[in-house]
Amino acid sequence: MCIRDRTETDEGHTLRKGDYRVWHENRFLYAPEVKIRIFIRSFMWSLFDAEEGKPICNSVQKLSLDGVFNDTLGGDRCGRLVKEEAAKLTDDDPRLVTSKAVQCNQVIYGVLSGKMKEADGTEVQLDNLPIISYFKKSGYMPMNNFIRGLADRKKIIPRVEVNLKTSKAKKGSVTFFVPVPTEGKSLTSLSDEDKILIRMFKDTIDASNVNVMQKHNEVLRGNVSDEDSDLSKDFDAAIT
């Protein structure tokens, strides 16, 4: 699930910017408002190449922002620096430039319900459709603050229905849309289907983290091999 920022599909259908979009049964569906329940919220760091249109780096996912986030480049948090580290660097330092491009993502695993439409206007009713959604940049704080508010009030978050709309915002000449979550009713309990889906989402996160760690360790092994090779050359030079 994401917020649409284009007014036209590849097929030429005109759409409203700021609607939510989901992929379901081989086509996109759209709606200005949806209802979700949040089963799991994880955090991850990512670095994206806008020119190439593909990710450069992803970190493991964790349930809090504490500790190390091993990443696919063999580092931590895809190169995002803490404030103390960043303050020591000049503005044109490549490490600082990279750090500013790294994004912190809230990854929401849950279910979506509501009346949506295909691009041609055909209505589709969805009930508890499993979704994964990434909230970052301008979408990060609205969701983070909302979830924190639920937690502060000791809400059992997977039971809470969240009404999601969007709001138009502007920064300079750039117009964009941010999520506007509000609390709906709370269910009295989770269904067996909910519990099965939560386990599946946990398995998905675990599998993703295994993949990240494999790439992380491959990079580290490659670096060690390069260092060993350099040391071997230095040793050979010293005895000849």
Residues covered by each model-derived region:
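Detector for Asparagine
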Residues: 26, 58, 70, 105, ...
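Detector for methionine-enriched segments
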Residues: 1, 44, 116, 141-143, ...
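Extended serine/threonine-enriched, polar tracts that run as long, contiguous segments within proteins
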Residues: 103-187
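OB-fold ssDNA-binding interfaces and closely related basic DNA-contact patches used
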Residues: 4-124, 171-172, 176, 186-188, ...
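Glycine- and charge-rich intrinsically disordered segments
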Residues: 1-15, 192-240
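Weak global preference for isoleucine
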Residues: 3, 36-40, 56, 108, ...
